């Protein structure tokens, strides 16, 4: 499993093993594979927990979206406090700087600094921003629309996807009140794929078998996104 993260295990079983590689990729490996084993009951302290729940309320996050953010936060704090900080990130992550997701996280981490008594670097702020920019889409996007802004290009992508579905399947998907929800869904998904965070979907095979037309539509959407955005879409995201 660790090979796909470009990581290596060094040391010996009787003297201690260490995971070696890029710090960002180490964190992704932890988040996607062994979070529960390492951090299920991680002691954050009452004040930090209250600030986290205040953040959830301010952003109107549902349980899924908040769980996503919470995990990133716990991993960030533990890694930082054990001396494993992110020193450098690829240029694509810098694009988050100044985004609405970054500004939301920036304000929150300023509060955390006051509690913790140490500074949290821009690189760490960018790391946590990924959990907001790529959150699981809330059940109700009405509240999130006030805080997270998306580019017009995403809506254009959706329209192109609907046009392609009409052309290839002769199925008309009406852009109704669910359109905004779908725009945010695609926006968050693109960010997850762009920044390398993978979500496991146990329903893939079931979805393929029970909803073949919908799956075909998802395949068409995949083609448009890969062609226009230049990202590889995983089957789990479909």
Located regions from the model:
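A cross-family "folded-core" feature that marks the main globular domain of proteins
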Residues: 1-238
């Amino acid at each position: 499993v660790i090979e796909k993260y470009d990581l290596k295990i060094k040391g010996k079983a009787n003297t201690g093993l260490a995971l070696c590689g890029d710090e960002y990729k180490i964190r992704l490996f932890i988040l996607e594979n062994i979070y529960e084993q390492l951090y299920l009951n991680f002691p954050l302290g009452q004040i930090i927990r209250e600030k986290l729940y205040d953040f959830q309320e301010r952003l109107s996050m549902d349980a899924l979206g908040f769980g996503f953010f919470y995990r990133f936060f716990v991993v960030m704090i533990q890694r930082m406090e054990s001396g494993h900080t992110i020193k450098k990130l690829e240029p694509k992550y810098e694009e988050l700087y100044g985004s609405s997701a970054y500004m939301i996280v920036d304000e929150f981490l300023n509060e955390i600094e006051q509690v913790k008594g140490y500074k949290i670097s821009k690189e760490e702020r960018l790391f946590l921003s990924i959990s907001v920019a790529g959150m699981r889409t809330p059940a109700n996007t009405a509240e999130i629309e006030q805080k997270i802004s998306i580019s017009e290009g995403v809506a254009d992508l959706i329209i192109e996807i609907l046009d392609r579905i009409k052309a290839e399947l002769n199925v008309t998907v009406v852009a109704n009140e669910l359109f905004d929800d779908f725009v945010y869904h695609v926006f968050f998904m693109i960010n997850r794929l762009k920044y390398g965070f993978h979500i496991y979907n146990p329903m893939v095979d079931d979805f393929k078998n029970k909803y073949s037309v919908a799956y075909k539509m998802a395949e068409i959407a995949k083609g448009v996104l890969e062609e226009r955005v230049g990202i590889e879409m995983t089957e789990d995201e479909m």
